[in-house]
Amino acid sequence: MNPLLERLCARLSDTIPPGTETPYASPSHARTEEAPWSGITGEEALAVARLPASDILDILAVAQAVRSARKGPLATTCGIVNAKSGRCGEDCAFCAQSSHHDTGAPVHALLGPDALLRHAEELARAGVRRFGIVTSGNALSEREFDAVCHAARLLRDRVDIGLCASLGQLATGSAESGNRGERARRLKDAGISSYHHNLETARSFFPQVCTTHPYDDDIATVREAARAGLRTCCGGILGLGETWEHRVELALTLRELDVDSIPLNFLHPVPGTRLGHRSPLPPMEALRAIAVFRLLHPQRDILVCGGRETTLGQWQSWVFAAGANGLMVGNYLTTAGRALAEDMEMLAALGVGEIPRNGEEARA
């Protein structure tokens, strides 16, 4: 094994909780009670990223050992609904819903509560643990926001599933409301327990991806959600043309924000977008990226989301070996995912149990 990976294994042995068995820690090894290991350093992450391809299985083994020690054998699942689609004024280079692109993506107004209820019930019946209401655009109007809160209260009372919202910016003012700072608290009161808002990429690479809002708006929204007591779900998209330095920069920003859950997406190139010409990441590079994020974030939920079918193909089940402990299942915003039953069967075949929903409400 590469000496760097051997050192990481030794560190893992020193920091796992008592009684936890992993491939790299013997029961007799001295351990601290609850070592506050926050993960490897940025320099170490870049070193792991640059190890030769022949080391990939060892990299995955170390990441899986960290996952096993810190997150256990259980996984989380989530599904989303495209509750408001298209006509987005942002110019995100990857996005089929941007009005700056001609992609033929679906366009529709905010779905009503009955439609959202049907989507949530379908996912709950399949055993999915969380349901996300996702809308296009920088932020919702006050009327739209009120409608989402009304629907959330209905879902909270009718469906046994955790509720997540992804409604754009929360922390800046709007012409209609004057203050979106209250929105996070209103969502929590309505039964939403988690707020999703991706940074998409590193601050230093962001101008290559989006020019219609500043990176600090996204940072402020994540912080606003956390201040309101919502779990924060925040990650990005890999394969936009960023370097490993950018990926590690993003991961360290997420560590600074102390987010609860990190969704990792992979670019699914859509014709008509500025990145429609790009090729998907090679599968082994994608798995290495998941492993690096796990080593940087040993305590957090890491979910593999959009683009996994295109990027990973037959390697999709390996995301757990790479350190992930969750999947987004079903369809995505404008692209079809794998059949829901197929994903749930894969989880069962892998012996990956599901985190009880009440176990997801508290911070890891």
Swiss-Prot record:
The keyword Iron-sulfur applies. It is an enzyme of class 2 (transferase). [2Fe-2S] cluster binds at residues 164, 233. The keyword Metal-binding applies. Residues 14-36 are annotated as: Disordered. [4Fe-4S] cluster binds at residues 88, 92, 95. Pfam families: BATS, Radical_SAM. Pathway: Cofactor biosynthesis; biotin biosynthesis; biotin from 7,8-diaminononanoate: step 2/2. Residues 70-308 form the Radical SAM core domain. Coiled coil: none annotated. One of its GO terms (molecular function) is iron ion binding. Its EC number is 2.8.1.6. It catalyses: (4R,5S)-dethiobiotin + (sulfur carrier)-SH + 2 reduced [2Fe-2S]-[ferredoxin] + 2 S-adenosyl-L-methionine = (sulfur carrier)-H + biotin + 2 5'-deoxyadenosine + 2 L-methionine + 2 oxidized [2Fe-2S]-[ferredoxin]. Its cofactor is [4Fe-4S] cluster; [2Fe-2S] cluster. One of its GO terms (biological process) is biotin biosynthetic process. Signal peptide: none annotated. Binds 1 [4Fe-4S] cluster. The cluster is coordinated with 3 cysteines and an exchangeable S-adenosyl-L-methionine. Keywords: 2Fe-2S, 4Fe-4S, Biotin biosynthesis, Iron, Iron-sulfur, Metal-binding, S-adenosyl-L-methionine, Transferase. Homodimer. Catalyzes the conversion of dethiobiotin (DTB) to biotin by the insertion of a sulfur atom into dethiobiotin via a radical-based mechanism. PANTHER family: BIOTIN SYNTHASE, BIOTIN SYNTHASE, MITOCHONDRIAL. Belongs to the radical SAM superfamily. Biotin synthase family. This is Biotin synthase. It comes from Nitratidesulfovibrio vulgaris (strain DSM 19637 / Miyazaki F) (Desulfovibrio vulgaris).
